[in-house]
């Protein structure tokens, strides 16, 4: 049974809504409202090009917000308007918004670890600036840490916002050091620790479904649920990321950086915050694996150890699964499974809850929320209508529905939070540290934990 509700009564057709004054100004190419400056350190890198710049453009197009972008990086000659245009080429950004953003974009060569360079960048960022600019570090964690140290020698303008990508640090100790350094520079309300997974559809939707539906909220607990599983598997291999990934692995790259934080929001409620969920969580089991040569989606993928830039002796895992125990009244006693891997055949990217079986032994009901496709599915048992004499279940049915389509992607939501001061997607200092506290015992266990092998294109851990 499949039902898609694309015409829900609370679906907003943006085309039929009157444009805001700012949107009309953007369309006319003469938005005179004060621009908010976002200076992106690492602005010529992959993250900026593939995710952040398209996200900013997406939100600017929706809201009419006037944004000025300064790309800052080590390269000495970057045509940033052309770079920006290339980044947005496939994004579907309206021409008017694209023209406005490109016209206001500039490039600044900077060594992120130089106080003198960062001071010059701040001077440029505060030109014609009413509110404090946003200084966004789209850099590897330890370069960000060095940049924050360099900011001690920079006169930061009032209201400046410091935004930094996860992971925060490379360990619990270094995460604490980064948080201590941030606290020396600005107040907590001026710090934005970015985890775009909190802006993915699945994470956003599960919170609303639980809190707003009597069908779900009363049974969203260990009394009625047997297992919660959060999975983000990928078909891709390294994709030229060996320099980063081979020193990191699946457990840190995905589970520590993202899925642990998603878990805290999935399990939180009005009485227990995500931070409290994290404090009450610990890892109790772990598995890991590494892909060998195989075929994924018709594409040959070499063995991980044969990928350029990989050092086989590191024994880096490309797939990790951990089981958590969460010691709260609502969740005590059931497994919380977090899993992520690369080179996976038929990958799942979802949040799922497996409910307890009924007394008649029928298969358990399962609720599934896709991370990316705005879809909800519920697996239930029913009678087969072709067998009217059946007195018990004899058919398995999946009820599925498209949710209200998202107006913004994950980085569009990040941009909205940055530009409006919304706090939902901001990680606290404690949350960033708790992620490391939870994962470090897992990493320590790897010395004695077998490194399983799975053929690329298959599903490990079966």
Regions found by a protein language model. Give the residues of each.
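Secretory/organelle targeting and membrane-embedding segments
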Residues: 2-163, 168-462
């Amino acid at each position: 049974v499949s039902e898609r509700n694309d015409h829900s009564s609370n679906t907003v057709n943006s085309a039929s809504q009157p444009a805001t004054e700012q949107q009309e100004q953007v369309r006319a190419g003469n938005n005179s409202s004060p621009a908010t400056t976002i200076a992106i350190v690492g602005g010529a890198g992959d993250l900026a090009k593939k995710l952040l710049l398209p996200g900013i453009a997406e939100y600017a197009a929706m809201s009419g917000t006037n944004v000025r972008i300064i790309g800052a990086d080590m390269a000495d000659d970057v045509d940033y308007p052309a770079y920006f245009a290339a980044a947005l080429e496939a994004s579907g950004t309206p021409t008017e918004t694209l023209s406005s953003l490109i016209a206001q974009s500039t490039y600044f060569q900077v060594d992120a670890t130089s106080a003198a360079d960062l001071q010059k960048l701040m001077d440029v960022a505060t030109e014609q600036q009413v509110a404090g600019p946003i200084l966004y570090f789209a850099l590897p964690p330890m370069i960000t840490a060095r940049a924050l140290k360099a900011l001690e020698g920079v006169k930061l303008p009032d209201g400046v916002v410091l935004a930094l990508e996860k992971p925060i640090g490379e360990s619990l100790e270094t995460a604490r050091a980064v948080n201590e350094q941030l606290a020396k520079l600005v107040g907590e309300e001026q710090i934005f620790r970015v985890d775009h997974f909190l802006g993915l559809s699945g994470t956003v939707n599960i919170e609303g479904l639980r809190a707003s539906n009597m069908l779900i909220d009363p049974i969203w607990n260990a009394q009625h649920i047997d297992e919660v599983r959060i999975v983000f598997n990928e078909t891709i291999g390294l994709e030229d990321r060996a320099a980063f990934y081979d020193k990191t692995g699946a457990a840190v790259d995905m589970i520590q950086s993202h899925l642990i934080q998603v878990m805290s929001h999935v399990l939180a409620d009005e009485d227990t915050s995500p931070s409290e969920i994290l404090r009450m969580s610990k890892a109790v089991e772990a598995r890991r694996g590494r892909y060998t040569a195989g075929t994924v989606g018709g594409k040959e993928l070499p063995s991980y150890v044969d990928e350029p830039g990989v050092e086989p002796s590191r024994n880096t895992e490309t797939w990790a699964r951990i089981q958590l125990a969460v010691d709260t009244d609502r969740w005590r006693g059931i497994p919380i499974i977090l899993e992520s891997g690369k080179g996976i055949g038929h990958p799942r990217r979802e949040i799922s809850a497996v409910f307890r079986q009924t007394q008649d032994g029928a298969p358990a009901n399962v609720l599934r929320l896709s991370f990316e496709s705005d879809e909800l599915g519920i697996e239930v048992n029913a009678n087969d209508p072709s067998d009217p004499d059946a007195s018990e279940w004899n058919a398995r049915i999946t009820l599925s529905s498209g949710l209200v389509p998202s107006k913004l992607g994950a980085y569009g939501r990040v941009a909205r939070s940055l530009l409006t001061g919304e706090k939902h997607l901001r990680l606290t200092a404690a949350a960033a540290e708790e992620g490391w506290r939870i994962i470090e015992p897992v990493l320590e266990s790897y010395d004695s934990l077998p490194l399983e092998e799975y053929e690329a294109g298959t599903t490990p851990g079966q």
